[in-house]
């Protein structure tokens, strides 16, 4: 569902070339950007049925197919970018989640970095949770995100991403939360003056594949596809870092966005009870959660 200059699309083009260079006599890869095949929900359903073989889906959509994906939506699940990368590269963490949708006809084949989600506002700088009080903040259409916003004192306003710019411009909402690229690629920085690095979520996008297609691959073919999936991850992460740097520079120097760096700890302390609530509801996730905490301990800010 991304434009052709987006890191995800660039990574999928690398996958296309890799597969066709090695298996082009049998497989022709076609990449469709910009929701040409429909919404993300439509594409997941098409992947389920085998009408298409792969698609990139957001974690919040996959949560409707498997409660295991609820874990990644938790605010302040990861202590740092390094902890996030280490956890997402750990098969003992991701495999039980990635394989949990097999009964629905698809499974995850790799993760895609979608950055860190932070608050940005039209006119109110966010330094502490108290600054969110009474502000109407657009959140993703997910119960987890609504609860997070309510706990932080803001007024959660779920809406589709395509409606956010107009809502900001017309002051229907006071702000939103997303990564830096929303400021530039989607023009939100033309309306919003402040972007606050509270670092509340690091949620991956997921490349999923149709199970029947994957099962029909020969052993050698599957090995080549697995290399291709790994390439998607590596290329996207590299491109993502460059894209975020460029977005931040444009937002600051062209759009006039002011970047703020509040202490995340007060935000984290307010949201922390959500972790135990989810683990009590889905106890099978607790061992995975504990392994993530090991990554957090190893890669927490300030540790060598």
Protein language model features and the residues they cover:
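N-terminal secretory/targeting leader peptides
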Residues: 1-84, 92, 101-304
């Amino acid at each position: 569902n991304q434009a052709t200059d987006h890191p995800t699309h660039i990574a999928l083009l690398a996958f296309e070339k890799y597969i066709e260079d090695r298996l082009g006599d049998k497989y022709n890869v076609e990449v469709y950007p910009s929701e040409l095949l429909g919404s993300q929900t439509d594409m997941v359903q098409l992947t389920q049925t085998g009408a298409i073989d792969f698609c990139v889906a957001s974690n919040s959509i996959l949560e409707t197919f498997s409660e295991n994906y609820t874990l990644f939506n938790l605010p302040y699940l990861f202590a740092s970018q390094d902890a996030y990368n280490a956890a997402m590269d750990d098969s003992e963490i991701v495999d039980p989640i990635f394989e949990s949708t097999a009964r629905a006809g698809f499974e995850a084949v790799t993760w895609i970095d979608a950055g860190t989600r932070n608050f940005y506002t039209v006119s109110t700088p966010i330094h502490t949770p108290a600054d969110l009080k009474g502000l109407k903040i657009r959140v993703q259409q997910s119960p987890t995100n609504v609860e997070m916003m309510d706990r932080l004192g803001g007024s959660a306003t779920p809406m589709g991403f395509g409606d956010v710019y107009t809502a900001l411009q017309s002051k229907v909402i006071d702000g939103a939360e997303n990564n830096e690229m929303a400021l530039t690629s989607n023009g939100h920085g033309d309306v919003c003056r402040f972007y606050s690095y509270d670092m509340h979520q690091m949620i991956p996008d997921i490349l999923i594949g149709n199970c029947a297609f994957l099962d029909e691959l020969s052993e050698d073919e599957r090995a080549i596809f697995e290399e291709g999936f790994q390439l998607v991850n590596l290329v996207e992460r590299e491109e993502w870092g460059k894209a975020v740097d460029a977005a931040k520079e444009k937002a600051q120097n062209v759009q006039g966005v002011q970047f703020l760096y509040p202490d995340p700890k007060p935000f984290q302390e307010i949201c922390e009870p959500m972790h135990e609530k989810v683990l009590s509801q889905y106890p099978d996730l607790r061992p995975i959660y504990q392994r993530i905490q090991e990554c957090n301990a190893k890669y927490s800010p300030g540790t060598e």
